[in-house]
């Protein structure tokens, strides 16, 4: 198991500058709670007593996923600081309690339980990998609590207890495959980390390729965080001797080794263009621009999105954390999540009654850095679709952008088992999965 950080509490208040004061109260780890909660008891949390409203932040601050998740925490804390500076929520300041999931899925479940049972938070912003989300999902459903999940994922899920502010497959994976088929070739080698997101994503990609005249020539996986990539690169060269598309769903530190050795093996983007769905500006910076220049990524947001709302977001982030920092899609989705929660709480006129907050969240809109987004009845966002190419400066040149926000489709329509299904939490009779045809 990866090393765990001690519990930390961040009480974030606004100050006279953009700058905020962050009062850090470091505490030793508490013993695991043995409190049990009935499936409906969390409908009223009682976590907003006094002058503060407690929320949880649960991401990997250590282990292989820290390369990606630390920056998401920064974005969530920035949103909280902005809200507190502007007067808070319902006249109260937000108190954020931060926990480290340590890139270990049982730890995520343990920390989610602690945040709900011991810290009595009103909601949690957290997770990155689908494995961590799947680990905490039973906790949120059994305790009838609320998670805001900020990362693109494989779909095939629609929980009452989760709001998904990252992309569904039809807002990232599917349009990127279409773009590759039109612009880069028909033969695909699929490489991913060995857990639920890459395997489910590749199931979708294979079904889409079959439906649209593409061909999957190879598929291989690495344990999450593994840097033993030589065998996979050899397989790619054998399966695509004359070049072809590499579709990459690796996560964490594996990407560092993969792209360095890919270049070392002579598999450059001119003949072997890769499309990644978990590499954004932060990862490009960590891996090195020289290794990623000319490769592609599909997201809803890039730092290079042109517009005043994004400029304000980027400028604020750099002012708070340093001019050398970059923004990326999961950070933007996490930032959106905090504001959508705030708006839902204000509409519901309570942070504690989670049923009212859930109902109030549906239909909320937000002028996000990517463009205006809407929280649909299926607990997913209507979002813009973009594809970017890594440039010399480590940022993405946008080569494709949708004209408008694309409605989310959680249940994939290329996969036979879920074709014709949808989700609608505004109607209890429909709920998380119902047949439309």
Predicted regions and their residues:
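Extracellular/periplasmic periplasmic-binding protein-like sensory domains
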Residues: 262-335, 346-352, 402-436
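Extracytoplasmic "Venus flytrap"
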Residues: 56-75, 99-106, 128, 194-199, ...
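Beta-alpha junction/loop-to-helix N-cap segments that form part of ligand/metal-binding clefts
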Residues: 67-72, 86-156, 165, 222-226
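Solvent-exposed, acidic/polar segments of extracytosolic/periplasmic ligand-binding ectodomains
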Residues: 362, 368-437
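Periplasmic-binding protein-like
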Residues: 115, 119-127, 148-150, 189-192, ...
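Bacterial lipoprotein signal-peptidase II cleavage site
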Residues: 27-37
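Extracellular/periplasmic Venus flytrap/periplasmic-binding protein
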Residues: 110, 154-155, 160-265, 304-312
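N-terminal export signals
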Residues: 8-28
């Amino acid at each position: 198991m990866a090393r765990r950080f001690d519990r930390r509490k961040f009480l974030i208040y606004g100050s006279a500058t953009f700058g905020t004061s962050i009062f850090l109260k470091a505490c030793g780890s508490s013993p695991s709670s043995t409190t049990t909660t009935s499936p409906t008891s969390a409908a009223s949390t009682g976590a907003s007593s006094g002058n503060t409203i407690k929320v949880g932040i649960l991401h990997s601050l250590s282990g292989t996923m820290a390369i990606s998740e630390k920056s998401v925490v920064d974005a969530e804390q920035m949103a909280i600081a902005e809200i507190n500076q502007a007067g808070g929520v319902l006249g109260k300041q937000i108190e954020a309690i931060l926990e480290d999931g340590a890139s270990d899925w049982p730890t995520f479940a343990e920390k989610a339980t602690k945040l709900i049972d011991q810290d009595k938070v009103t909601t949690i912003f957290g997770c990155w990998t689908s494995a961590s989300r799947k680990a905490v999902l039973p906790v949120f459903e059994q305790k009838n609590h609320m998670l805001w999940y900020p990362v693109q994922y494989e779909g095939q899920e629609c929980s009452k207890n989760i709001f998904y502010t990252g992309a569904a497959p039809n807002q990232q994976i599917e349009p990127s495959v279409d773009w590759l088929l039109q612009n880069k070739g028909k033969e695909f080698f699929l490489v991913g980390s060995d857990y639920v997101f890459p395997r489910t994503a590749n199931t979708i990609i294979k079904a889409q390729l079959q439906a649209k005249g593409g061909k999957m020539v190879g598929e291989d996986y690495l344990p999450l965080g593994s840097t033993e990539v030589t065998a996979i690169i050899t397989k790619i060269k054998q399966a695509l001797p004359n070049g072809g598309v590499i579709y990459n769903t690796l996560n964490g530190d594996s990407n560092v080794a993969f792209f360095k050795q890919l270049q070392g093996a002579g598999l450059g983007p001119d003949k072997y263009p890769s499309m990644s769905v978990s590499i954004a500006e932060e990862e490009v910076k960590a891996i090195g621009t020289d290794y990623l220049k000319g490769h592609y990524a599909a997201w809803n947001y890039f730092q290079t999105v042109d517009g005043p709302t994004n400029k304000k977001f980027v400028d604020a982030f750099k002012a708070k954390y340093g001019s050398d920092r970059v923004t990326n899609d999961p950070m933007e989705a996490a930032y959106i999540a905090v504001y959508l929660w705030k708006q839902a709480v204000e509409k519901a006129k309570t942070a504690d009654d989670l049923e009212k907050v859930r109902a109030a969240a549906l239909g909320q809109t937000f002028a996000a850095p990517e463009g205006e987004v809407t929280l649909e009845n299926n607990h997913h966002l209507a979002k813009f679709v973009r594809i970017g190419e890594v440039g010399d400066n480590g940022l993405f040149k946008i080569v494709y952008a949708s004209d408008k926000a694309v409605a989310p489709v959680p249940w994939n329509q290329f996969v036979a088992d879920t074709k014709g299904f949808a989700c609608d939490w505004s109607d209890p009779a429909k709920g998380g999965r119902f047949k439309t045809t």
